[in-house]
Amino acid sequence: MNQIKYKFYLKIILLSLLLVKASSAEILKPSKDVDPKKVVKIQLTALMKNDIPYKDRGIIQTWEFAHPNNQKATGPIERFINMIKTDSYAMLLNHTDHEIIETYMSKNVATFEVTVLDVSKKYYKFKWQVEKYNIEGALKDCWLTTAVSQPMPLGSSI
């Protein structure tokens, strides 16, 4: 009887672990409940763990919160993935730390100063802009990224 209970509990534990793993792989979708800073945080956290739990998941998550006009300019997704991997943005991939500071906020636009510490211990600063989408449809009133500046190198950490 104890062996049956043991197998039952083992199955429950394994199923729980699989569900946790599956939920961590889930791509978050834009929602009007996600505030502007949280949009940037979602994108940066995803890029910080780009290949977890699968290759380029962080870039795909970042794409999900890109404004449709931004997607038109940088897409399709395969092109966006390649763009993020260029020297201009590669420091965002698997970075070790980031800081997000709000520099401007209005009813429809928010701008943040983002500082990233990359894997080689160099700091970079970006201007990250999100806007509230105002066209009818599933994205109406969602905050979405409209622009990310080129990086400004700030030097190495000690």
Segments from the language model and where they lie:
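Bacterial N-terminal signal peptides that target proteins for export
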Residues: 2-12
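Bacterial N-terminal signal peptides
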Residues: 11-21
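Boundary at the C-terminal end of the N-terminal hydrophobic targeting segment
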Residues: 22-27
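TPR-adjacent "capping" and linker segments in tetratricopeptide-repeat scaffold/adaptor proteins
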Residues: 30-32
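Short, aromatic-enriched amphipathic alpha-helices that serve as compact interaction elements
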Residues: 35-51, 61, 65
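Short solvent-exposed beta->alpha transition segments
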Residues: 53-107
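Exposed beta-sheet edge and beta->alpha loop/turn motif
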Residues: 103-158
